[in-house]
Amino acid sequence: MIQVHVIHGISQLFLETTKNGLLKKQQIILYYEKAFDDSNLLDFELFDNGEISKGSIGKPDDCISCVSRSHAYNTICDLQSKYGAGDIVVIFPAYVEPRAIADYFVIMEDDREIMIMDIRTVSTALDCMSFLRDVTVEKLGEEMAKSEFLYRSIEYSDSVFLANHNRISPVSLEGVKEVLCQINSMVELFDLSDDGTLPISLSELPIFNFEDPTRFSPLTSESQITPYVGAQSERIVWRSITPMHPERFSRFIDENLEVIFRSRGNLWFANCIQNQIGWESFANVFSMDRLDTWEAIEISAENYLVLIIQSSRKSKEVIFADLDSCLFTASELASDASTWIQLPDPLYEAIQQRQESGE
């Protein structure tokens, strides 16, 4: 089986350096870059154990993601027929959708009786010298902003390669890392050397899990964030097995959302005792949806919430205390559970709108 290592977002400014660095350790590399003329959309180059193949694919009006993923998949199929097994690095330029690549590969493999390839790692490479500017670029007209692709790539990746990390000040580098954490707190960071080599081999990178439910969120690309450098962002986890009062949690959101970069988890509300609510927030927007209904008479669930907070503005102890105040008190737990469903729920409309829209 071919093990595929996908790298997203490499700009042409340091693509050549990164490619040369990878060639020192990898035998097969396929990379794409935007063509410099109007005849084709993408140029590609395949390094296959010393043999070099070059060409151009697509047309000016084609979708970059569609063209590159189809060509990459067919190329990998040819390599599998040639070698049977091995590793290949596939490098996609900026403005290629990371989820579109993985979805296409998985769908194509599902249609086969025998799998021939597996996505082993997914990473994003970024330029530290321009990252804080790129991440705030807004869209022009109907075109997607570069920042949107950065959000999607960083969140979808398990690791990020930092190019030009030694060409900015230590304070600026910490700012880059802090903003990366605000977008994806679980991503692992690795420095690219000046010659494009990594400090570890690709086989040592975090393994890609296509089924991970936190791998992608539309909120990430729909929300425009302002990088908070020096905000001392911190990842915290809150748990409880007591149902929550919906009105008090709504108040918590009103009072704290501006200091929470991202939150994800499952919540258990007293007025929806036979469901958990899937919760997510990013920047200043949130999304929630009812999960599967339990049929059992006796029900017990857990509130589980992962938050990335601006600890310079509000400590984790205060956030924990605010969340604990959303829980049912002992006297409320002793009340008639049949009345809980009638509790005021300012967030109910958000769930209904999501369900009615079919999202």
Indicate residue ranges for each PLM-predicted region.
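Nucleotide-state-sensitive switch-loop elements of NTP-binding domains
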Residues: 2-133
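Short, solvent-exposed amphipathic alpha-helical segments in soluble enzyme
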Residues: 21-25, 45-48, 106, 177-181, ...
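Short, surface-exposed beta-strand/loop "edge" segments at domain boundaries and coil↔beta transitions
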Residues: 13-16, 38, 270-277, 313-319
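Short cationic amphipathic helices and targeting signals
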Residues: 5, 90, 160-161, 234-239, ...
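A structural signal for short secondary-structure junctions
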Residues: 1, 257, 271, 297-302
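Alpha-helical scaffold elements adjacent to nucleotide-binding pockets in ATP/GTP-utilizing enzyme cores
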Residues: 100-107, 156, 175-179, 322
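Generic C-terminus detector
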Residues: 298-359
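C-terminal accessory "lid"/substrate-recognition subdomains
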Residues: 36-40, 114, 131, 138-294, ...
